[in-house]
Amino acid sequence: METVSSVPVFARKNVAYAGATLCCLLWGSSYPAIKSGYELFAIATDDIPSKIVFAGYRFLFAGLLLLLFAMAQRKPIARLSLQQYGQIALLGLTQTSIQYIFFYIGLAFTTGVKGSIMNATGTFFSVLLAHLIYKNDRLSYNKSIGCVLGFAGVMLVNVNHSLLDFSFSAMGDGFVVLAAFILSASMLYGKRISQTVDPTVMTGWQLAFGGGVLVLGGYLTGGTLVVHSATAVALLGYLTLLSSIAFALWSVLLKYNRVSMIAPFNFVIPVAGTVLSAIFLGENILEMKYAIALVLVCSGIWWVNKPKA
């Protein structure tokens, strides 16, 4: 029988739950930060190449920061086989580069509300893919109920007149759903790689590589990024820091825990993003739907992780 002390720290449920919540709160805080970043760097709403450059620098710097952190911990960052470098490059290309390109193009052809809801389908993909890949992570009644409740919370926080538009745009909604699927699949691939490569090193390299590809692709398609103030640099620094912490911690959590246990916390992201946007961007926060949405999301997470009777 395993004692508590013999269980890896990040495999302990209370640590895993707290860590996953922190990751999603950090990602949620990127919503208002990115909106402010577009203003500070004077990036137009329809300027997708410049948005890709902006995202690319964020991930490139986050990756380099993680590699420096790994070196400070005396972790070898270059003692990888050619196969491992290839695996990490593929991870960076899919999880960071291709996924974000589809996501940004998709958002340009759909509404923000529908984009947020379509992006939340990623949790379903994660749970379904885990069911197909891992024998100890099968789909269950509790997981199904939890995912439905969490998705309902995401829909509720985005309720407005645009939800009455039931049209489906392949270039818009379809690309956002495709981005969500790519992210889910690549995170499961990252879980596999992290069994033989330190999660911090893996995440650092994949973010740096994927971010570099985004920067290059953004500039080649006409994007620019001009620094107008120290505030803009500070904001990019914050986005860099939150990305490095959240992605590295998420990789560690996936290494030691079942995908279906961690993935539903993603439902917290759009709710946290909406609430934090309301707080920091002066939008209306005193709406009952936010409280109900949070209850639905938390209930969904509880159902997914509810012990079997």
What are the roles of these predicted feature ranges?
Residues 40-95, 125-129, 182-186, 203-221:
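Transmembrane alpha-helices of multi-pass small-molecule transport proteins
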Residues 28, 32, 60, 92-97, ...:
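Hydrophobic/small/kink-forming positions within alpha-helical transmembrane segments
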Residues 66, 128-129, 141-160, 267, ...:
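Hydrophobic transmembrane alpha-helices of multi-pass small-molecule transport proteins
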Residues 57, 96, 114-121, 189-212, ...:
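Helix-helix packing/entry segments at the starts of transmembrane helices
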Residues 37, 54, 106, 132-139, ...:
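Hydrophobic/aromatic residues within transmembrane alpha-helices
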Residues 12-17, 47-50, 80-85, 159-182, ...:
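Juxtamembrane helix-entry segments on the extracytoplasmic side of multipass membrane proteins
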Residues 1-53, 93, 165-192, 212, ...:
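Glycine-/small-residue-enriched transmembrane alpha-helix faces in small-molecule transporters
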Residues 71-115, 119, 156, 239-257:
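Specific transmembrane alpha-helical segments of multi-pass solute transporters/efflux pumps
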